[in-house]
């Protein structure tokens, strides 16, 4: 990004950049752009849901479909954008490596009867049993 270092107090993303951008590039860039004590917060799909998406990417399964370890780039759905995700240990290592302290990891669970933007009632039911989306809140130290 053509902006000076330490330009912002907050870097926030609701899916978007942290879903479709490589975290090995986006996390260091967020660290560069934040001032000391700046907030980095973003939401995206959980590593678990990435492991449980059907082979055709059309539905989420109640079983593991893909390996957890080694996940990074998901580009096997023709015609769809590339998505990125990492195992939890790798997220933590990446945040620490770039000077972040994790303040919170919120695993979103829709309440019973919630209005939702999930693609189907089956996805909503799945998200009531396992975390489908999460919110990270990290502080630059």
Where are these regions (language model features)?
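Short alpha-helix
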Residues: 72, 81-105
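Class I S-adenosyl-L-methionine
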Residues: 76, 108-128
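A short acidic, Gly/Pro-enriched loop at the edge of an enzyme's catalytic core
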Residues: 1-10
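A short SAM/SAH-binding and catalytic strip from SAM-dependent methyltransferases
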Residues: 9-24
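A short glycine-rich, Lys/Arg-flanked "PGG" loop and its adjoining helix->strand segment in the class I
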Residues: 24-39
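Acceptor-substrate binding/catalytic loop of class I
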Residues: 44-52, 76-90
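Core SAM-dependent methyltransferase catalytic element
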Residues: 98-101, 119-141
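Conserved class I S-adenosyl-L-methionine
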Residues: 39-72
């Amino acid at each position: 990004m053509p902006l000076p270092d330490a330009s912002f107090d907050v870097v926030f993303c609701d899916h978007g950049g942290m879903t479709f951008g490589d975290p090995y590039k986006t996390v260091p860039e967020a660290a560069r752009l934040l001032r000391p004590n700046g907030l980095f917060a973003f939401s995206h799909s959980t590593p678990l849901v990435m492991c449980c998406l059907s082979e055709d990417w059309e539905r989420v399964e109640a079983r593991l479909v893909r390996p957890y370890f080694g996940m990074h780039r998901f580009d096997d759905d023709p015609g769809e954008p590339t998505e990125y995700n990492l195992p939890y240990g790798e997220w933590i290592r990446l945040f620490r490596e770039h000077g972040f302290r994790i303040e919170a990891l919120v695993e979103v669970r829709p309440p019973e009867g919630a209005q939702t933007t999930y693609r189907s009632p089956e996805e909503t039911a799945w998200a009531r049993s396992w975390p489908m989306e999460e919110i990270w809140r990290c502080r630059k130290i």
